[in-house]
């Protein structure tokens, strides 16, 4: 009975989040509190157990990388890179998509996709409307590139930070295990968009010439002091992460110290501090870990492991691949961070021949594929949609041009993202089968 109630509270919490995305950290904290109360009354989940279920290293990673990313973003270098890349595309639709997706991938290697999309999408909208190119395919490609970039490294986005803590993985492990696969999938993404988009002349939209003459691509002013501090802290952090394994130091605490330094030097205003240190994300994942701990305490995750073993007849390689596909499906609805927290204990039970870390890469690739399938799964999907609609509202003279192109809706995104998820999963299945062989 307690297990049923625990599962019901977990599902209800994420139903609320799915319906009202804003304030998701408050919903998770409330759900965590309810589960701790239920567990305490029933004797199945005490406050001590709740604290022990939290991956504090993941929270340290989130804090540190959020602070470093905020410092670099505040310096203006990300916006400058995006504007420079857009200008190099020379107004050609195909090159706008490729180059903006590449810069998105590059920034996402070290910054979470929310920061990346917040910087890149406004530049993309200005460039596309100025050149009469439908921006929707380009923005969709950028969201997918952000997911791939975040999945390539340990510090790129939240799911990998969780898996790093759960699997005791290091920075170099992700470079060797995830980056090659993600680079291949990025190349496949470009081929897919070239095939689907075809003739870019069909993507041309009629734009008010008066708006084009008045709207220029603006380079962001760079604060060289903040940029210098940000780059020094970032490169020292990366060196520390690379050496963390040989030095037997956990990466999260290196990132934590770097984050404290970034906050001290970043000139953040009082109202910016909470956001700069990833406050909402830390609260969300802290509460999420407590909720997943409650599921574990009542045996729900043990049941899931037993079910997987039964379905796959004890073949760990098949189990890892099935886990990857399951994680992709769940991620579409609850997002990558939640899937990572829920499935990490399951991945920890897999013992594969060949690359012993292949189970973690299977889970990471499944989460990445699911994140690409729908806006609800993509960390920055809702932000990109809001930026698009806000841009058109601020420039009503572009309404007819926007109406002539693709409409940036959940349904339109799925038309691109869902087939890509299938392609990613098929290729990732081959990759994991080879690694685990």
From Swiss-Prot:
Induction: Part of the probable 17 gene mamAB operon. Keywords: Biomineralization, Ion transport, Magnetosome, Membrane, Transmembrane, Transmembrane helix, Transport. It is found in: Magnetosome membrane. Disruption phenotype: Weak magnetic response, very few, small magnetite-containing magnetosomes. Near wild-type localization of MamC. Magnetosome vesicles are approximately wild-type in size, shape and chain-like alignment, only a few have crystals. Deletion of approximately 80 kb of DNA, including this operon, leads to cells that are non-magnetic, lack internal membrane systems, grow poorly, have reduced mobility and take-up and accumulate iron poorly. It is a multi-pass membrane protein. GO terms for cellular component: magnetosome membrane. Plays a role in biomineralization; might regulate pH in the magnetosome. This is Magnetosome protein MamN. The lineage of its organism: Bacteria, Pseudomonadati, Pseudomonadota, Alphaproteobacteria, Rhodospirillales.
